[in-house]
Amino acid sequence: MVRIIDMECSVPYGVNAESKPEKPEKAAAEGQPGYGMANYGRIFRARREGGDHRPAEDLDAYMKHLATVGIVRSVPFGLPNAETAALMTRFPGRFIGLARISINEHHGMAGVRELERLVREEGFGALGVSALVDCLPASDRRYYPLYTKAAELGIPVRIYSSMNYANDRPYDLGHPRHLDQVAMDFPELRIIGGLGGWPWVNEMVALVRRHPNLHVDTSAHRARYLGQPGSGWEMLIQFGNTLIQDKVRVGLSAGLVGQPYETLIQEYLALPLKDTVKEKWLYGNAARVFGIA
């Protein structure tokens, strides 16, 4: 059986009765329907309706299902930090905590202290930065204290790197070009460009090739489209099978794309990649960047 580290796992709600995550629609701007973050609900609702969703009380069965299909570790998506910490406590060794620090909520050193607390006390394994949430590009200097602390702690940072659908903010906040300056300024920091840089895939691949410390994941996109001519992913498939084969990680995003894990895994196994490369994409590369033996 293949082993998989899922870079974006939609965990069933209700891990902690005192804290429940909000769906993207909840954060929508008031006023015009379908505006701002609510636009995600309009675009992705049909996909989510068919996903692998399970009731909160079935969380143990959900975890057994992940093990059955070969998913040995997952990065929870869309959960507050407290919820992620509860997951890691309940299922030791099954989750990699992504410390989501919004500089809109944690100003200056407050964010730095919170990141250190999450890593040292709660066992989080990475920093998460989102231009979509903060409405700031990753190269904004207000993030630099967090990057410095992440490098000091020896943890990677995963940065939102894609076009966003929140139509109340610039569409290119997550353009891969913003990673270039960060990678130059922090050569010791392991950086993961999340969501593959779509639709600027060529630029993402070029930057991953340029910077030894820059990596990419495929979250929010189905593998069946990565291998289709004309999809815009041709360069990732070509270079991901050769020159950057050690720098690509897989995010299944089952809850977002609305397909069961078995289907999504088989789509990756069907990609025109060498068998040794498939193992790297699915497990080996993520294990290395997160320091998993």
Task: Locate predicted features.
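Mid-to-C-terminal alpha-helical segments outside catalytic/metal-binding sites
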Residues: V2-S10, G14-T68, I244-K247, G258-A293
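Active-site gating/metal-coordination segments in enzymes
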Residues: R73, P80-L173
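Active-site environment of divalent metal-dependent phosphoester hydrolases
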Residues: P12-G14, A82-E83, N104-H106, D134-C135, ...
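Distinct, well-ordered alpha-helical segments
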Residues: T84-T89, G108-R117, A138-Y143, D168-M184, ...
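A structural motif corresponding to the C-terminal end of an alpha-helix
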Residues: K64-S74, F91, L153, D185-R190, ...
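Glycine-enriched alpha-helix->loop->beta-strand junction motifs that scaffold or abut catalytic
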Residues: E122-A126, L146, E152-P156, D185-L189, ...
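Hydrophobic faces of well-ordered beta-strands that scaffold small-molecule active sites
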Residues: I5-M7, S74-P76, I96-A99, G125-V129, ...
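H/E-rich (His + Asp/Glu) clusters that bind or coordinate divalent metals
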Residues: R190-I192, G196-A293
